[in-house]
Amino acid sequence: MRQPDIEIYLKDADVDHKAIAAWLSEALGPCTEWVQKGQTWKCKAGNVPVTWLPKAVGKWNSLYLESDQTPWEDDIACARAAFAVLNVEVRC
């Protein structure tokens, strides 16, 4: 069953929101410019609202996709795709 949203965590020093935008542009569609709101960064990749929160949990950055319209069934599938493309440590 498809999840209503997806959230994964990427290891701190290994990736930034610009690398994430490049990956999401390929997977979901073109990313809008990132807008910083406090500690968070927001953009839209295709039709999917995206939130990037650096150091959300210790050394882990949160990537939150607010939609069920992604190519991934669940957090684990998204985490595997992120690992394959970005070559970074990922948790869900």
What are these regions (language model features)?
Residues 1-25, 30:
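Short, extreme N-terminal segment that most often corresponds to the first beta-strand
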Residues 8, 24, 50-52, 63, ...:
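Generic structural hydrophobic/aromatic packing signal, biased to beta-strands
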Residues 69-91:
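Short, hydrophobic/π-rich interface segment
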